Amino acid sequence: MIVFTRRITEADTVTGTLTLAVDSRIKSRLRVTLDDGREAGLMLERGHLLRGGELLADADGRQVVRVLAAPEAVSTVRCADPHLLARAAYHLGNRHVPLQIEPGLLRYQHDHVLDDMVRGLGLNVDAERAPFEPESGAYQSAPHGHGHDHPFVRLPAHS
């Protein structure tokens, strides 16, 4: 079985594709079937969402696959009014909903209760099948910096 262990940024040859829904693209350890039917495994660094278009390689770099975001059941909100779109993003984010944000568009995994809430804000919602590429903040668990250092200071225990 092929085991993909690392992300790469470019490859001379891509030997296959791997189409996954977002619920699988958040996992770092996973048994998968490539689009050509070959069995494979993912043993990747934890805490990173796989994006459509990313390349994965096995240990020696002979096998390289391109990840594709599978079409899945999503709710899509399209709106030319940035204020209305921002209000919807605020309310969805307040519910910790993984959210894809693009100019004039919000997308989340289909949920009729959330659809009703967004419609209540005055927006139209389309239920459709489309690739879902949420903001990584909902899944990112790796440490991150802010461009400056913070020394660790132990606070005194409460008495």
Curated annotation (Swiss-Prot):
Q: Which UniProt keywords apply?
A: Chaperone, Cytoplasm, Nickel, Nickel insertion
Q: Where in the cell is it found?
A: Cytoplasm
Q: Does the keyword Chaperone apply?
A: yes
Give GO MF terms, alphabetically.
Answer: nickel cation binding; unfolded protein binding
Keyword Transmembrane helix assigned: no
One Gene Ontology CC term in the entry = cytoplasm
- Per the record, the domain of life is Bacteria
> Which SUPFAM superfamilies does the annotation name?
Urease metallochaperone UreE, C-terminal domain, Urease metallochaperone UreE, N-terminal domain
Tell me which InterPro entries the record gives: UreE, UreE_C_dom, UreE_N, UreE_N_sf
The alphabetized list of GO BP terms reads:
protein folding; protein-containing complex assembly; urea metabolic process
Described by its record, this protein's role is as follows: Involved in urease metallocenter assembly. Binds nickel. Probably functions as a nickel donor during metallocenter assembly.
The family database entries (NCBIfam families) matched by this protein are listed as:
PRK13261.1-1 (NF009751)
Family that this chain belongs to: Belongs to the UreE family.
Q: What is this protein called?
A: Urease accessory protein UreE
What is the primary gene name for this protein? ureE
